[in-house]
Amino acid sequence: MIEPLVVEELHYSYPDGTAALRGITLALGTGENVALVGPNGSGKSTLLLHLNGLLLPGRGRIEVGGKPLSASTLEFARRFVGLLFQNPEDQLFMPTVGEDVAFGPQNLGRKGEKLRECVRTALERVGLEPARFLERQSYNLSIGEKKRVALAGVLAMEPEVLVLDEPSAGLDPRSRRRLIRLLTELPQTKLVATHDLDMALETCTRTIIIDRGQVVADGPSDQILADRVLLETHGLELPLSLGR
């Protein structure tokens, strides 16, 4: 069976020469929910930006849906992998919510009633009533609403893999709980970069720790996230639900 996402010996350095990723190797199985955790500056966001081709590897190989990621396969990769940015302001740029959510599928050729139904379905999936939100101006929304609109825009593309960068950051408790429920319901393969280790424990069966651009641990979440020494060695703390 083809694994939806494979990364082998991925290296990447910033333009100033700073090494951001140093030999990252990982693979995600179909339908798997995986948390990606690590301290600030560990390379999490840089890795995610590689997974739908916003950054291309310095060295190493990425396969998306069985196809090597390269300049010639970017269109396929960006349909296959939906990326949610940490800051929704980086993702919302159209005048209204409806236009933001429609942007992706419209560029894939959807139009008319099929496009409208796609937008309505995506908004409903993230708990936003189309009648209330379609004509809302994105810049007037709360941070939680903006994050949900951004996620609706990703879901409207119907990707096979969801790559989410700090999806719970800035959310109030009710919005966070709604997000957790949604993550457990969505059928896609998911890679979730987060500092919210309680959310990781609740939504992801597997956890990968990266530090200084390298994978330092990879295993079942209930083992990785209960290992106080391992977590503290890499600038993390036990989830609150496990006690500190």
Swiss-Prot record:
It is found in: Cell inner membrane. Gene3D superfamilies: P-loop containing nucleotide triphosphate hydrolases (3.40.50.300). CDD domains: ABC_cobalt_CbiO_domain1. The keyword ATP-binding applies. GO terms for molecular function: ATP binding; ATP hydrolysis activity; ATPase-coupled transmembrane transporter activity. ATP binds at G38, P39, N40, G41, S42, G43, K44, S45. It is a peripheral membrane protein. Pfam families: ABC_tran (PF00005). The keyword Repressor does not apply. Residues 5-237 form the ABC transporter domain. Its EC number is 7.-.-.-. One of its GO terms (cellular component) is ATP-binding cassette (ABC) transporter complex. PROSITE patterns: ABC_TRANSPORTER_2. InterPro entries: AAA+_ATPase (IPR003593), ABC_transporter-like_ATP-bd (IPR003439), ABC_transpr_CbiO/EcfA_su (IPR015856), ECF_ABC_transporter_ATP-bd (IPR050095), P-loop_NTPase (IPR027417). Its main location: membrane. Keywords: ATP-binding, Cell inner membrane, Cell membrane, Membrane, Nucleotide-binding, Translocase, Transport. Probably part of an ABC transporter complex. Responsible for energy coupling to the transport system. Belongs to the ABC transporter superfamily. This is Putative ABC transporter ATP-binding protein gll0289. It comes from Gloeobacter violaceus (strain ATCC 29082 / PCC 7421).
